[in-house]
Amino acid sequence: MKRLIAISASAALLAAACLIFQQTATKAQQAGGQQNPPPGQQPQGPPRGQGRGPGIEALAVDEHAGFEAIFDGKTLKGWDGDPQFWRVENETIIGESTAEKPVKVNTFLIWRGGQPKDFELKLEYRMNSTNSGVQYRSVELPDVGKWVLKGYQADIDFENRYTGQLYEERGRGFLAMRGQMTRLQPSKKQIIANLRSGDELKALIKNNDWNQVHIIARGNVLTHIFNGHLMAQAVDDDAAGRAMSGLLGFQMHTGPPMKLELRNLWLKNL
C-alpha cells in the first residue's frame, strides 16, 4: 500500500511538472509573437529551430554608405593622364581620341589618391567605339611610356565582346571570361564554375548608354559586377603573378577614334 501511494505521488509530481512546462512554453511563444496554428493548418515562416534573422535585401547600385567620391565632378584633381585625351565636361570625365590625335600606345588616366588593397569600386561608363577598361591593383611601366599601366582590368568594349571579363593588361592575358569563375595557378587557369552563358550576360549590357560597374577585390578574390549582375570572378592563387594592391586607372585603347565617359566614381577601402 505504501508503495502504491509513493508511485501515485511521483506520477502527480510528473504531471504537474509537465503542465508547468507547457504553460511556460505557451507564454514564451505568445511573448515572441509565435502561436501554435489551428489543427490542420501549416505553421507560417521558417521551420522552428532554423534562423529567424532579417531577410536578405538586394543591394542598391547607388548605395554608397562607407564610400568616398574620388571624382569631384568638376576637375581632374587627384588624377593624372595625357591632357590631349582627358578632360571634364558636365560632371563627367571624358577620354577622347580623334583621327588627328590617335592613341599610339594604350594610355591611362591614373588615380593618384593611393594604391588600394582590398576595396570596392563603383562607377558608371558610356562609350561609342573601340575598347577600354577599368584598371586596378596595377603598376606603372615608365620604360614603355608615360601613363602606361600593367595589372588587373575589368574589360569593356563597344561591341561587348569582352565587357565584364577579367583581363590582365601586359600580363597573363585573359583570367576569367564573362560568365566564368576561375582559379589561377602558376601553371594553369581552371574554370571552377560557369555563372551564366556569356551571351545571356552580354544582353544585360547597354549600348550607347550608361552602364554601372561594381568591382570587389578582397584578398585574392576578384569580382566584376555590371548592372547588378555577376559577370566574372577569379581566385588568384598564383602568388608570384598576382597583385594584392596597386593603382586605379581608366584605359584609352589604340585603334579608331573613341570617346569614353565616366561618372559617379566611388571607392571604399575594406
Residue ranges of model-derived segments:
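Carbohydrate-interacting regions of secretory-pathway proteins
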Residues: 26-270
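Residues marking helix boundaries in flexible regions
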Residues: 6-8, 21, 57
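Bacterial N-terminal signal peptides that target proteins for export
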Residues: 1-13
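C-terminal segment of classical bacterial N-terminal signal peptides
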Residues: 15-24
